[in-house]
Amino acid sequence: MVFQPNSGFVHVARRGVTLVELLVVIVIITVLMAMLLPAVNVARESGRQAACQNNLRQFGVGFSSHVARRGTYCTGAFDWRRDGCVTEVGWVADLVQSGTPVGKMLCPSNPARIALTFNDLLSMAWDVDTCVPDRRGSPPQTMPDGSRRINPCRFLAEGDPSSSTPPPTGEDRRLFVEKEILLKHFNTNYTASWYLVRSGVVLDGSGNLVARQPGCSASLLARGSTLGPLNAARLDSSSAPASNVPLLGCGAAGGMLEANLGDNDSNSPAVMPFTRGPVQTATLEAPPPFSAGTPMATWWAVWNATLQDYRGFAPVHRNTCNLLFADGSVRAIADQNGDGLLNNGFPSNLGGFRDATVEMPPDDVFSKWSLRPN
């Protein structure tokens, strides 16, 4: 500061910030951001995992209400091909009809945002098939004003014969599925367990899987070869505690969506409807056919050595997967080796398993072929 007679005191101009100082500040900010961002991401994922667990708990409350009213935990899988009309049959329809908007309650961490059954709804040709429940669902209803109400699946299958309206095709079909099914909350990115929607196998005296209806093919995925949705009596008499029997979990992608639907682009991942049931540990397939007259001791030992194929569940929460159990509890199961799968006892290098690390031990997650006591 200096004094000038005619102008008084004046300030000397301050030195500006040098380039080096500016770079130091930028480096400090960058380091701080690098330190904070992982913590922010962890906090964000913790929130997503909590939201997912809350979804599953609410679904569990719905299952408990359903079993109290109707004896079964649900009416089946969210699967038009195997279980019938998705707006009337299946655990998603059960919950939506009771006021739970399942399609709005998606696992927020799962990159798959839609169920694989939408590919069938978009393109599968309907035909009479007595081996599965009627995919058309309930018959049309005449309303008090004389109008007809036709459920979406029936309209997809046959249109409205009373007005000579054909079923929608192409873009009209896509828009119809989007408006009448997807946007009305009939959707999920959770996968049901085989126990929830099939619960047990139907075997003949030689230990072979059979179809209860003549002329139909036997399959672990078919309702006709299984005991159907889990009921209270079957669970109560089980050899496993309800806290170990999984019902629902974060879903793994089982394919890609065929067309744009809502916020989901074509070729987006889509989750499978339910896990595949009991398979042999050496092949990941159901036991092969037994010869007629095979002793029970022989075929029972083969079935008893199988394990549930839980590859339909995915560890989408930073290597953990949320599972809902039959007692209403929700637990996070960790993918310990980072292979993207949850191993419940399968050997390494089979079906995508990186090694034989058991991430779902039998004391935590039940995996037997039958809920019945041995």
Predicted regions and their residues:
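N-terminal leader/signal peptides at the extreme start of proteins
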Residues: M1-V17
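N-terminal single-pass transmembrane signal-anchor helix
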Residues: R14-R48
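Conserved hydrophobic/amphipathic alpha-helical signal-anchor segments
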Residues: A34, A39-V89, P101
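Short catalytic/ligand-binding loop motif for oxyanion handling, primarily in non-cytosolic enzymes
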Residues: V67-A68, C74-G76, R82, R113-F118, ...
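Non-catalytic, alpha-helical, charged scaffold/linker segments
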Residues: N110-L227
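Acidic, glycine-rich loop-and-strand cores that form catalytic or ligand-binding grooves
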Residues: D172-T306
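C-terminal accessory segments of extracellular proteins
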Residues: V279-N374
